[in-house]
Amino acid sequence: MEKDILIITGGCSGLGFEIVRQAIARGLFICNLARNKEKMEKLDSLFQSNYKGFVGDITDEKFVSDSIHQIAALGNIKYLVNCAEKACFKKPVEYTSEDVNTSLAGLKGMVLCTTEALKVKEESNLKIVNIMSSAALKGNKGEALYCATKWGERGYTESLKEAYKGTTVKVIGIYPGGMNTEFWDESRHYVTEEKSSTFMNPKDVATVILDNILNYSSLNVADIKIERN
């Protein structure tokens, strides 16, 4: 029997890691695309079965294409979860060209991975899950560039929905609020450890996401907004 595969980007830490861990426990084969070789090696050791890691940059078109074609040879690609992201929190006058390029990596990777998965699947029988942020729904002080990239991801997600309406390609937008993960480690000037400790547990968020994308054969949950208490 052909194995069902969930591809995820950015699955080595935080919410991505929790999705990997829980999805394996639910019987899926996971293929993780991420750039951190050291973290990937730890996951290779931790998940010795039903898991395969691909180390590389999801903004590299050749890496994405080669990886997804290799994955297609392993079984049935059923889900694509775009979870990778980078953030930069500064005052509006402080952003640089490098900040823009770094922040846009998530959007570029989302587009490249989705495009290649759609090609391999011949635009059929694929569920695309784009994990963004509540910042994709509103503007936040101190998050001008982050909001801009998330609004771009949301625009791409909504356009995909229209493009594949009435087909077997389903598109889900996920909009979680702040989570207590290492995402904030490089932005402690913006969010302190004390503050992030009050944010949502990524384990709970991963459970909500997987419950909604895996459990219902007769319906599709189009959008999920997850707010912290």
Predicted stretch roles:
Residues 86-99, 142-145, 184:
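Conserved mid-core segment of classical short-chain dehydrogenase/reductases
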Residues 28-42:
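Conserved glycine-rich Rossmann-like NAD(P)H-binding loop of the short-chain dehydrogenase/reductase
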Residues 69, 73, 105-125, 162:
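Amphipathic alpha-helical dimer-interface segment in Rossmann-like NAD(P)H-dependent oxidoreductases
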Residues 133:
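Residue(s) in the substrate-gating loop at a strand-loop-helix junction
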Residues 9, 77-85, 106, 130, ...:
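Rossmann-fold scaffold of SDR-type NAD(P)-dependent oxidoreductases
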Residues 173, 193-229:
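C-terminal helical subdomain
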Residues 12-13:
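Conserved glycine-rich cofactor-binding loop
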Residues 114, 149-150:
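Active-site helix of classical SDR
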